């Protein structure tokens, strides 16, 4: 069990500068040890550029809706935005056995002067039998300032019947507020 309350999760290394004009978002790996060490259980088996969890968003830029305030407060809100949220707590638990793995990741951001922190939760279950691994990953994010919740449920499998043949796939269902999205990778 790894837990941290009101941690200083400052970035330990800076990111390389990348100029990206494509429609695909540039993925930066998380370099904060709490979120990068022993995080393999939360990775899903799929083709490249598929990440169900992006821990870099935890402690990222706060959501603001300055229009909710009166004129003077709106100016204060606009002029006092911060670039990153403090994290009140983060908890990660993982248990890996011979045939079943389980993990939980939760984090809650601190409230700022003109913003409420976001909440992030994820659970992972993975089982192995012979040449087959099957897993489930569920995530939930609450962003109260913009009145938005997001849920992702995914099932993944990895089948290795021989040293030269490997099949893997991923089914994903997402729900952002009341809008559904689906994904499949094989």
Predicted feature locations:
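Membrane-embedded beta-strands of outer-membrane beta-barrel proteins
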Residues: 1, 91, 123-125, 155, ...
């Amino acid at each position: 069990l790894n837990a941290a309350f009101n941690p200083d999760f400052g970035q330990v290394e800076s990111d390389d500068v990348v100029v990206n004009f494509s429609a695909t978002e540039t993925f930066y790996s998380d370099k904060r040890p709490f979120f990068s060490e022993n995080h393999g259980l939360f990775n899903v088996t799929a083709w490249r550029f598929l990440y169900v969890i992006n821990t870099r968003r935890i402690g990222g830029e706060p959501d603001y809706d300055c229009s909710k305030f009166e004129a003077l407060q709106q100016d204060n809100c606009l002029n006092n935005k911060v670039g990153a949220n403090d994290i009140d707590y983060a908890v990660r638990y993982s248990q890996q056995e011979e045939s079943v793995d389980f993990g939980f990741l939760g984090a809650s951001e601190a409230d700022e002067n003109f913003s409420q922190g976001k909440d992030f939760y994820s659970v992972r279950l993975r089982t192995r039998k012979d040449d087959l691994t099957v897993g489930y990953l569920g995530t939930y994010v609450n962003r109260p300032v913009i009145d938005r919740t997001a849920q992702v449920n995914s099932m993944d499998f990895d089948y290795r019947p021989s040293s030269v043949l490997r099949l893997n796939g991923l089914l994903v269902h997402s729900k952002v507020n009341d809008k559904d999205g689906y994904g499949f990778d094989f």
